[in-house]
Structures are given as structure tokens and as C-alpha cells.
């Protein structure tokens, strides 16, 4: 074998070639063909030394990236990556090769800089690995060498498979098509070992998945198997059977995991194996029988799979292999599916079940395991099966949604919305209809608890999906949302599920997750691995001592002895011992019970537990089960060396049923063991134990650091994959979710809308100017189309802030306030969930990340949705601009809109694609059809999004499952290092695989009688040598779902109880340390035969305020049934118990000393409603079942049940009675219908005992502590009014310190009255005048406030002043007599300072020239302080349209910007309709429906749109002529003048013409009408007439012909001819068709010019886009306006008018931006005033408009011109301010006054300003140089440089660059110390050319200058 081992570097021995084998990212075919083919033996060598891709390895980027990556990890980049843990020597070799390659690159490839790098190749991106972004480098595969694979054989299978799964080199290794035999054999060995790992299933799947698709399986292995036949060397042939066994094992694993996708490759290999085996056998090689059996098994499986493949039933890898049936034809429980099958649901198959044997032994361990597996599975399957069958039979019932089912809960219209990433994998957000569930109180409901199983189907359960509840948030449930995790089989079907698919979901109440883990554990455990079979299965009553005691171990009990003197006595009693260790099997050597602080039975239990391998300890209530259990653990931990007999640690496993019990037990252990504890279970309430939870231990830095390297590498690798997948998946999932939260914007659906429908949608009916309003460009056409736009409901997009939420949720807030004022009660749902959820599995995201995700989701919704249901608004910018209230809807309108959209989105009916294709105009559809079409588009969008994220979903799920297995490996390391591992039964079920690895030798089960036997068995491993069960089977039993299984099949009998019943030895604790004797009497002898009282309970004090420590109050008030949860409540009992609790609180008992128990959840919340937190905070309220193991001083018990039918429910169960009656220490008071309960035998005995001791009756006797002789009887809540303060009805009569008597009734609390507040009047004299205090007695007396007359010294007025206030301190209230500066009288009182601002109204003249009343005090501010007053005077200016301006002086900006004219336009449009818009100068296109029509059809477009010409043949024909043109073309026939020969209805001849429609008038019958003169020829006897079809008027034909054909020279307007009588346009008339068509053609030409051709519009649109991009100042200073213009230009279907509007906006906004930019050159005060003016212009410009009117353009241009002059003037003045003479300053001020006038800037003003500015140019500088123009010219001339040498720094200081003008060095500005100049002819970025100095357009040294020079210099050269 050694001779055949390949050379380590896989190269020829004497070769030094640098060739490396292929890696993951193989070369493209073209590159591969160009490469040199490596020698065959190089590939056969298998594993060349690890390295990167040959190309990637030889360029500097790969090297430096590697260096940087290693430095970032804090390691030397030249160190080997895997030599930290002392791995095999091949890793050091890897390091050397890496270093050699790096050195080789540095020394031998220096010329690579001059070569083209590989990433510059066009084909380089083809090398990317799947799902890798183009910018990322492919991760390089580290090759797996021979030595490395050999080292893996020495390691644990788990480490092997994790290492292979996370290595990129595995795929490369298995990709070779040939390799040496010994290398192939080693690979098979390693793969077989990897696949043997049981805890790493996902890693095994990953490795097998690579193997399945590899050349290793398809080529290498078949060649190897065939080669066995011809192998000549005997030694090698003898080793083949072992290798064949490895291959068969791999094949078996492959077909079991991938039955569908691997059957072809494996079948070929299997067909070759028999031939090779026969050849080997023939050559004398011994073939083991097991190998042949395994091969036969694989052959059988493959034959079965091939048959199924031919049948077409083998399609996916989730196919379940059929196992052969057992001899008795009963399916083996090991192959039974955990989930229900189709046959179980539909065929109602009766399952094969055996009862749990509780009175004898089992025949075998196999039957024992089978029995418990089937019973446990049936316990959760039966309710689901029977519920679904009942549901299927009820589908035709009309009241199905209201019907209640016994076994299941139903959720209608359930939809799988979106996948979500969680730590456990992929979960799905599912939404169901909440309408039938309005009555559900989710915070208490047991619906949809964590771990509950749901079944979903959309085809009446012909197919179904299974899932479990993975997360339950109350807020989400109220909205019908829950998160589900689907099982593996269902996940395969989810790819085809869309968010629009509607399912029926049913829920079974069982905690399925616990069932699943236990059932899987029972299937996996082998019969021989079940411990204690002699006792558990065979029921042998002889129990041996633990095996580890047979080694002679001795115990030290001194740590258990608390008293030092007792320790000494114990040591003296143990004669001959030099140390305190004893033989525990010898009872005589044990310390005394007094020394150990134990009673007799506890001592017996301790001895029994430590000396028997199976110890059962029964502990009745209060007997100290936990105390004894802790003593046992302390003894075991102290003597760990006795049972830890190997180097490997084996912790003690403690299992408890509830989290509370686990906390109690572990806290007790902590008192004697401060370290090495691990807690696994639900969230702990213990601060002490939080440090020992798995989550905390995992997060410790030391733990991470000490983890094996292969786990750390795997963690990083998988985490990276998860993050990448999560990022992509999250975005897609949130997109899917958004589709159900509102209406999508149309642009996101465009891809799924046909072009015809898109054009129709976007060119929809424009009936309101707001549709195309400039400010509503972001408005959604989709909303309008769906009837949700401004035409139907006004849009409100203000977020659901406090002001909106308060209105919308007023009722909820009130309810919330009421809830918050009540005491906190642990919700039953929360309690159940707390025991189900393992804390380590809870996902706790940082609050910061939650906020970030929420913000990102909000942004995504804002981007995608035109209307959001959560905001009930559009979510558009347009909507937000209207948040001032203009578009606010009423609250009920919002609700209607929200409900309407929500209902439509949840509907299932959609339009089919065929139906959609038949639609031409989507606006012609009714609203219902529109929503159907929208849902079709939405489904296409959702399906596409779902497809995109599907691959990421699969990647994340696989990675998460591998990560979960990795976590288990981490947890395994934690648990193995512990001394004590504490688990709940749920935790033990979930961590069963780890427990099998941890192999705890000692298992202690607390509350063992409450645990199902199957759960206990699944917790045990074959390594268990000592099992201690502690519990009490006479208290609560395990809970089963199915009553039949619990009672008739004994499923509810725990292992604890069964072993007791079959006479396995056990010890019962006999002394109770909890209850006073009166209470204990109820349990003995009725429940426990000989339960004795410990002396400590005889010392309890009596309960205050009552005559007895124990009393049962009888009543017969009926109960009430609660609809949800099948619970009950009793209002009478609730009120009584609450009042009794309040009474005990008055006896000065602490709230923590009182517990209220009830037997039903419904009563729990009935009680809560009666208990305000202010009074009852601290009182605990529980249901009995959740209080086992607890105790309190006083227990108040409400039994609830009281009905005429005598149904007592589970009050007849002795176990529950035991728990209920044994929780009290000192006092217990119960209320119930004892007459009904007496029918139960046990209750009858208890009631008899109570009656014997006078402790039962209709009334409870209360005893007053202050008046012992006074008793009060209470039977109902109202009776407690007799003792309002907890004493009696007598008055208190206690004399208080103030002298008054206590006014309360007798009260036992606050006997010294320190807290009492006397409420009687005080009446103390508090001043010299004899006035008395008006306050109540307990309040502190205040200064006298009685008013008396006093004279105020400052003014002499007499005032009524409070007695205690001195006259000098009082403010006189007489009116002030002083006059203000303005002359008006002061309005303040005399004692106050005079007013600063006079409030008298005076009329003043404003700056605008108008007079207006203002407050007198504001006048000065108006004149000098800049105070503004809005002038309300009507403007009245005659606008350009001729109408008076409707605005006010203020709204028109003092005449500078007039408001739009609001008069109706009423001008005739080209289509002959009157304009319906306000008078705005330029009429918009007509929005009416077009009335053009012909005989074939009518135009359906808007009147202002281009009509489509009719292409039907013209129908104008008669017997003389016929037109041969198309209907829309001018006719090619003349009019016919032959009289019509037809007769009218009246019998007279027609008066019309041949071929024309006959007029309806008769010359004889309607003579007056026909001969009425209009044109002048109507009364001629042979006159012929034509009737107009548009208005039915008739005219003489010759006159009408002339009228229709005449062309008047003065006719300017182009419009249709109209009826001479009624003026109706003539549109349809065949005789005058040519004339009409000519007019219509002219009108169409005008329409086209108005709208513009598509080419012109596109050209203009691109021109404006380019123009806008050049406006850098606009982009910088007005970014929102820039973005708005950019978005508008990006829209489709813009008209010429739209583009004209945009062009105007660009121009005006650009001017504004330039002016804004110039503000920095002014004085601060001037800047503020000009900025205000600019903001006014910007505000006016931002108003919504379709176009600018001529008036607006005039006003705007004039104002911008004024501001331009003003800015120019003020800038010049600022620049030369210090050098300006007084005369020039006066001139500047005069120009400024003209420019700052409030009225409009006229042409006269402009001319005057121009003249003055020309005069000022010579003396004021034109730029920021601070010098005059003359001085600038002189300086430039003196320096003498050509243009382009002058520059300025960041702050505008000028400097010059000599020589060529290009910057070659940096310097410092002497004025501001900023950087100036530059390097390499490149100017510093903060500097720029100072064109204001010499007029240069570019620098002297620049590309532009070098190519073109400065333009003027070129001109000079010419």
C-alpha cells in the first residue's frame, strides 16, 4: 500500500512544474482549450497542494487581498491558516507552498505589470461562482490532500462531516475523472465515516449532494469497481471487500437521501458490484456475509425505485422508501411517518393500538417501545383526523364559519404571504380571516400557541401542508397574522404556492414539537439501548444498586451536615475511619437523620435514592420532595469521584416538568455548587440562573475561543452564506408583503401589463385638472382607475401619527387604560407558551436593528405602494403636500376606503388572461372588473417575485439547518463540561440527540408523575446507570389530548405511577411540613392513608378576622359557559372571593401572603376584571393546574362549577382535588356548590369531614379583632358591606391627636391611626382678626384669605385685600388713569405696569397705499420695525383677460403676482364645445367625449384627442352616383339633384332628393313649417329640401349647398359649420360629407400641432433633460424642484403643453437659483430682505397649475427682472462699500427705493433703473474683486499674463499662476490660509478660475485651452 501512495504534491517526482489541479471556479471552455493538458498521473494523484486559481494566484490583487485579510484577523499573512490547533503536518506544508508561491510571484513575475491583468479580460466575469456579485472575488478552494484526509480518519465523525461540508475543496476533489486507487479508497473511507454522524444530518446531506453530482461517483468509482476484476496483486485483492463495503454504505446513504435524483448513477454502480464480487470470490478472496446482505438490500431498494420511476411516481427526493411489512402485517413503528397520512385523513383507518400495561410486564422491549410510540402518535393525530373528517362532511353547511368543532380550530381564507428568515430557518408569515374570530381574546386564548400543529389545504384536503407555529405575537394575531414553520415535505410544495392562493387551515391543540422529538427518539432508540429493562419492561421488583457502587466507592457526608458538633459526633461513631468516607451500602455507617436535618421518611428516601439504580420517591404535598432531591444531588456532587470513574465527564441530568420547578431545583443546587451548571428550558425568571443558560454560556468569549477550529471555521462560513441569502430574501419577502398592504404603483406592474392596456391606463380619462396638475406628477393613475383617487375619495397620506391614531383607536385606548388599571395575571396562553419555548431558540433582535428594519420596510412600502392600508392614504409626495387639510377625508371615509381595498385584495376571483386580451380600453370596465384585472396583474407580479427569491430561500434554509446542527455541536461541548444539566421535559425532548452524546450516568426526574412515560424514556440514554424519579402520582397526572387514550389505553399513567402499581419498590415521604392540621385533615385519610404532621406546622398562628382557619362556603348560584376555550365562570363566586381577599388585606396581611386559585381559566379573567391594581397589587391569581409545587399562607379557592345537570367536569378527578386542597399553609377558604360536588365520592368524604368539624356552611363567620364578641356572617359579596373596613359595623371611636374622633367604621389595620387623615373642618384661628381655617383637619393651615378693606399706600385706592396680604404687596385692581405715549388711556389695572402696546384700533396707510385698521401699538412696528400686516383690500386690477382680479392686495403680493381669474371661460373651442375651465388665457384641450361620428361608428376618445379615421367604405350612393372612397376620405361623386320618388307615411311624395335621407316633413301636411322663409326659396313649388341629421332642421337644398360650400375671407376660426337656426355643429351628413371632412381634417391638424408629434415631443423631452442636467445651481440650491422637474421629464405620454410648462419652470427656477446664489455677496440685513422676496416668488411659483397664463408670465418676468436689478445693485454696493462717496450712496439708495416698491415693476421703472445703473457702473465694481473696473484693467495690464492665469481660493481671494498657467505646486493663501495652487498641472479642487479678473472661460493650461485656446486670443491671431 505504501508503494501506491501518491506523491504529496501530486506532481511527477522529478518535475518542478507549477501546475495545479482544477478548483471550484473552473476555466471557461475557451480558456480551458488553450491551456496545456496536465499529465494523466498528475490528476490521478488526487490532491495537489492547496492553493488558489492559477490565474488568481499570479496577479498582485490576489496576493494583497490575502495579506490584508490575514492582517484584519490579527495574524501574520505568511502563517499557515490552520496550524493553531496542532493539526497534521500537511498544514505546515500548505503554509510552505503558499509562501513559496507568494515569493515566486514577487521574484519571478515582475513583468506582470506590463501584461493585461486577468480581470481586464471580457470573459473574466464568467468565472464567478453562482450567486456571486460581479465585484466580488471568487472564494478560493483549499485542496484536500492525502495526508489531510488521513488525519480526518482519526477524528470524530461529526468533525469529519463538518470539515468536509464547509470545505470548498471537496467539490474540486470529487470533480476529477480519474485518480489513483489508494486515494479513491481513502476518500470512500472518509466519506463513510462522515455519513455515520447522526447529529449533523444537514452537513451529511450537503456532502452527499456534492457526491451525487460528482465525476467521482459517475466515472471514478465505476472504473475502480471494474478494475478489481483484473487486479493481479493478491494483497491488494484481499483489501477490496473492505472498500466494497464502504462503497455499498455510501450507495445506501445516497439512495435513502436522494432516491429520485441518485437512482440512475447508483444503479449503474450497483450493477457492476456483483461481477467484481464474484471475480474476487473466484480468486479466493473471502467476502463477508454482511457485505453481500447489504448489497442485496441496496439492489432491492434500487429495483423498487426504478419501478416507481417507470410508473411516474418517483419525482422528488422526498419519496419515502417502503420497508417490508412485519410478520403480523402490522406496519413497524420505526417506519411510520410522524405526520398524518392521506389515508388516515380520508379513509378513517382504525389505527393499531395497544394499551399501556399498568398491571404487569411487557412481552418485549420492542413491544414496549411500539406501544408508547403508537399511543403518543395517536394522541395528536386523532383530534386532527376526526376534526378534518367532520369538517369534510360539513362543507355544504351554510353556517360552516360559525360552527364549532370539538377537535380542531378552523381558520378560513388563509394565505401564505411571505417567507421570513429566522435563526431556525425559513418561517412564513401567514394571514387568515379574523371576522369569525372577533370574540377571541388572543392574550389568553390557547389558539395558535408556539409549537401547535396546523394543516393547510386548498383542495378539500386532497393535498395538504403541515406546519407548526413558530412565533406568536398578540398584535399580529389580532390582525390575523401568525408565523409558521413548514415541515420538510411541505417545503417542497411551497415553491408553487402564491400569496393569492387561499387555504383552509385547521389547528390541533397538541404541542406537536414535543410529540415530534419524542416520537423520533422512540423510532431511533434500539431495544438493547433502553436502560433498566429488568424493572421498566419486565417489571422485576428487585432493584439493584448502581453499577458504579460495585467498584467500592465510598461517600463523604460531612458537607450535608450543617451542625459542626453533629459532624464531630458522626466521625466518632464511625470507628476505625481516618476520614469521613463511608460505605453507603451499609446503613450502620450513615450519619443520623438529625445530623442531616431529615425526618424518618426523608432519611429513608435519601438512603434509597443513593443505593438503588432505579429509585422512586413519592412526596405528598408539603413533605419536602424538592428538599430531599437537593440533598441527593448534594451527596452525589460531593462524591463525584464515586460515579465519575472515567476521564470523560458525565454530568448529572435533572429533568423537571415546568420552568418554575426547574428554577427552584437549580437554585437549590446553586447553594452548594456555584459553577458547572447548565440550564436548558424556557425563559428563566431567576436572576441567579441566567448566567447558566445556554445562550449566556454560548456568548462567553472564552467559550468561543476554546471551540475546536473546525467548528469556528464552519460557523464563519455558514454565517456568511446566511447573511448573503437573508439580505436578498428579506427585500423580496418585504416586497411580497407590500402587495397585500396596499395598491401597487403602476410603474412596478408595467412589466406585467400588456402594452395596449398600459397605454390605455396611462392615457385615462382626464376630467379634473388635478389629474395632470404639475404638483401631482407623482399621483397614481392606478388609484384613479380603481376608484380610489381624488374623484372618489380624497387622498390623505399623513402618517398614522398621534392625532390620527387617537381618533381611529379611541375605543381601544379606553379599553387599554381600563386593562392597565387591573392587576397582572399570568395569561394561560403565556404560561403554556413559556413551557414550550426553549430560551435558547428565542430570537432576540437588538432594538436598533428592529428600528432599522422597520424604517427600511417603511421606505420600501412608500416606494412601492400608491396607497397604504396602514396609513389609509396614498403615500405619495403629492398627498403629503396636501397635509394642510385641503385633501383630508372624514374618518368614516377613510375607514370605508381601507375596508374596501382590504376586501378587494383578499378576493380570489381574477380575470383570466384570455378575458384580459379581449379588453381594449381598461377605463371602459366597471369597477368590479377593474379589480379583477388588477388582481391578475398583481398575481403575475407576486409569482415573479416569488420565483426570484426561491433560490435564496432554499439557500438560507439549508444554511440555517446546518447552523442549527452547528449550534448543537457547540451545546454539546458546553454540556459535556458541566457537572449538572437542568432541563425541562420539553428541552430534554428537543435535545435528545445531544443527551445521547452527553451520556449522563445519573438522571433525576422531578415532577416525574406529571410526565408521559414516552417522554421519560426518550430522555434516557444507554449510558444511564442511575435513575431517580421524584413525584406524586396522587397529584396531577400527565395530560393527554384524547380522553379515550388517557382512560382506556392508560396513556395518562406516567412511568412513575406504573412502576408503583407493578410493585417496584418506592419510598413515600410521610411528614408534611406545609399545612396546618385542619387543612391536612382533608387529605388524610381520604387521599393519603398515613400523612403525618411535622411539629413545625402545629405552631402556626390563627388566621385573623375569621373564626376558623378552614371553611367551605356553599351556594347554588349557576355558572356561565365561556364560548372560546370551552371554559366556565361563576360571577357569584368571583365577587365573593374578591371581597374576601379585600377583607384579609384589611387584616394587615400582605398581598404576597394571599393567593386566589380557581379551577377554570374563564374564572381567572372574571376575577381579574374585579381586581384593580391599586387595591390588589401583589395578590397572585392562578388556575390550580399551574400551581402545583407552589404554596402560600392563605388560599382562596373558587370551584366554579354549579349547574342543574350536575356536571362537575374535572373536579371529580382526585389528582386535581389533591392539588387544590393542599396549597395552603395557614388558612384556606373555598366557595362552591357543595351539594352538587357531594355526588363525587371523594368530595362526599371530604364534605363529611368538614361538617363534622363545622367547617362548611352557607355563611362564613367573620370575627372582629377589635370587638371579639362581634361576629358577622357573609354568604355573598354584598354582605361584606357590613364590615366595610375589615372590622365590624361599630364605629371606631378612637380619639385622634387633633381631638376629633375617627369617623371610620371599626378597622383592624392602622390601629394607631398614623395613616388616618381627619376630614372634619379645622376651625383653628389663623389670624389676629379671629378668622378660622377653612380647610379640613389633616391639611396644614394656610395664611388667612378672608378679604378685608385696606387702603393701598401707592395710589390711595381702597381695595378688598386678603387678610394675610400686606397693603404694600397688593396689586390695586382699579382701572389705570394714566395715558400712554400715543395719547390713549392705559387698559391695565392700577397696580400693574402700563401696557407696552396700545390695543386701541386705529386706521393707518400701509406701504401698498391702502388704509386698514390695526392696533395702535403695532403702528410703530409697521412703520419702522418691519412688522407685516396682510392688506385685505380687494385688488380689482383688470387682468389681461379683461376680468377684474379676484384676489386681495396681500394675496396678489401688492399687485406683483395677481391671482388667477376665476371667471368661467365659455370660449368656443375648435371642437365647437364651450371651454369649461376658468379663464386662464389659453384653453386646455376639451375633455368632453368626442361627438364625431359616421354611419359606421362613433369616436370614443376625448374631444381634445386625435380621432382615429374610419377605414370602412363610404356608403354615399344612389341610383345615379356612387362614392368609391373610404368613409374618412373626401367623396369622389357629385351631389344628386334628382327629386326623391318615395312616398312619405302620410302618402304624399317626399320633398327630398335621390339618395338622401327623406325629410320627416311633408309639403302638404306641414305646409307652414316647410314653406317658412329662411333662405328665400322655400315657398317655390318645386323646392327640394335636406334634413340635417344633427338637429333635424330642414333647409332648401340650393341655399344650404351654397352655405355649406362657401369660404368667407374674413373667417379666422377653424370650426365646423353649424345649423343656421340652432347653431348645432353639422358633423354627420352624407351630402355635405366632403365639406365636413375637410373641416375635420383641418381640426385634426390643429389638434396634432397642439399635442405635437411623437418625434417632436421626444426631441424636446431629450433637449429639456440635457438642459436641466446643465443647471448645476438649480440642482444645488433647489434640489426638490430639480428632482420634481427631472421626474416629470422622465414620464411618458407628455404633451407639447406639458413640455412648454416644464421649460418655463426650468427657466424661472434657474433664474431664482442664480439670484439665491448671489445673496452671499450682500450685507446680512439686505440679504434677509431679498431672501424674503425670493421666498415669496418661490412660494408663488410652486402653486399647482396646468400652464402659465399670459398674466402670470408677465408678472413673473417683471418680478424676476426687478430682483435681478436689486441683487446686482446691492452686490456692487457691498463690494465697493468702503470706497463709495456719499453722493454715490444717495444715488444707490434712490435706485433701491424704486426696486423695493411694493407695486408692480413697470417698463417705466425699468427704464429709469437702467439709466441710473449705467451711471453707477463707472463707480461701482462689477464683480467680487472689491475694486473698480478701471483698477481691474490696470492690474491685469500691469501683470501682463494672457487670459487664464488668474485663479481664486476657496474663499474668493485672487492669485495668479505664472509660466504656462498650470498649477505645479501647492501654497497657502496669505489672506485666509487656505490651500492654493496644485500639482501636475492640476488645480486644487477647492480652487477655481477667476474669470471675473480677465474674462477667461478656461484656464491657460487645460484640455480646452490646449485644444481651442481662449476664443478672443484666437480671434486676435486671425
From Swiss-Prot:
<feature type="binding site">
    <location>
        <position position="1869"/>
    </location>
    <ligand>
        <name>Zn(2+)</name>
    </ligand>
</feature>
<feature type="binding site">
    <location>
        <position position="1853"/>
    </location>
    <ligand>
        <name>Zn(2+)</name>
    </ligand>
</feature>
<dbReference type="GO" id="GO:0004386">
    <property type="term" value="F:helicase activity"/>
</dbReference>
<keyword id="KW-1000">Mitochondrion outer membrane</keyword>
<feature type="coiled-coil region">
    <location>
        <begin position="1741"/>
        <end position="1820"/>
    </location>
</feature>
<dbReference type="Pfam" id="PF25396">
    <property type="entry name" value="ZNFX1"/>
</dbReference>
<keyword id="KW-0399">Innate immunity</keyword>
<feature type="compositionally biased region" description="Polar residues">
    <location>
        <begin position="877"/>
        <end position="887"/>
    </location>
</feature>
<feature type="region of interest" description="Disordered">
    <location>
        <begin position="1"/>
        <end position="58"/>
    </location>
</feature>
<keyword id="KW-0391">Immunity</keyword>
<feature type="binding site">
    <location>
        <position position="1849"/>
    </location>
    <ligand>
        <name>Zn(2+)</name>
    </ligand>
</feature>
<keyword id="KW-0862">Zinc</keyword>
<feature type="region of interest" description="Disordered">
    <location>
        <begin position="75"/>
        <end position="140"/>
    </location>
</feature>
<comment type="similarity">
    <text>Belongs to the ZNFX1 family.</text>
</comment>
<feature type="coiled-coil region">
    <location>
        <begin position="886"/>
        <end position="967"/>
    </location>
</feature>
<keyword id="KW-0472">Membrane</keyword>
<dbReference type="InterPro" id="IPR047187">
    <property type="entry name" value="SF1_C_Upf1"/>
</dbReference>
<feature type="binding site">
    <location>
        <position position="1872"/>
    </location>
    <ligand>
        <name>Zn(2+)</name>
    </ligand>
</feature>
<feature type="compositionally biased region" description="Low complexity">
    <location>
        <begin position="30"/>
        <end position="42"/>
    </location>
</feature>
<feature type="zinc finger region" description="NF-X1-type 6">
    <location>
        <begin position="1546"/>
        <end position="1564"/>
    </location>
</feature>
<keyword id="KW-0225">Disease variant</keyword>
<dbReference type="InterPro" id="IPR045055">
    <property type="entry name" value="DNA2/NAM7-like"/>
</dbReference>
<keyword id="KW-0863">Zinc-finger</keyword>
<dbReference type="Pfam" id="PF13087">
    <property type="entry name" value="AAA_12"/>
</dbReference>
<dbReference type="GO" id="GO:0031380">
    <property type="term" value="C:nuclear RNA-directed RNA polymerase complex"/>
</dbReference>
<dbReference type="GO" id="GO:0051607">
    <property type="term" value="P:defense response to virus"/>
</dbReference>
<dbReference type="GO" id="GO:0002218">
    <property type="term" value="P:activation of innate immune response"/>
</dbReference>
<dbReference type="InterPro" id="IPR046439">
    <property type="entry name" value="ZF_RZ_dom"/>
</dbReference>
<comment type="subunit">
    <text>Interacts with MAVS.</text>
</comment>
<dbReference type="InterPro" id="IPR000967">
    <property type="entry name" value="Znf_NFX1"/>
</dbReference>
<dbReference type="GO" id="GO:0042742">
    <property type="term" value="P:defense response to bacterium"/>
</dbReference>
<comment type="function">
    <text>RNA-binding protein that initiates the antiviral response and is required to restrict the replication of RNA viruses. Acts as a double-stranded RNA (dsRNA) sensor that recognizes viral RNA and then interacts with MAVS to initiate the type I interferon response. Also required for immunity against some bacteria, such as mycobacteria.</text>
</comment>
<feature type="zinc finger region" description="NF-X1-type 2">
    <location>
        <begin position="1330"/>
        <end position="1346"/>
    </location>
</feature>
<dbReference type="GO" id="GO:0005741">
    <property type="term" value="C:mitochondrial outer membrane"/>
</dbReference>
<feature type="zinc finger region" description="RZ-type">
    <location>
        <begin position="1827"/>
        <end position="1898"/>
    </location>
</feature>
<dbReference type="Pfam" id="PF20173">
    <property type="entry name" value="ZnF_RZ-type"/>
</dbReference>
<feature type="zinc finger region" description="NF-X1-type 1">
    <location>
        <begin position="1298"/>
        <end position="1320"/>
    </location>
</feature>
<keyword id="KW-0175">Coiled coil</keyword>
<feature type="region of interest" description="Disordered">
    <location>
        <begin position="876"/>
        <end position="896"/>
    </location>
</feature>
<feature type="compositionally biased region" description="Polar residues">
    <location>
        <begin position="120"/>
        <end position="129"/>
    </location>
</feature>
<keyword id="KW-0051">Antiviral defense</keyword>
<feature type="zinc finger region" description="NF-X1-type 5">
    <location>
        <begin position="1471"/>
        <end position="1488"/>
    </location>
</feature>
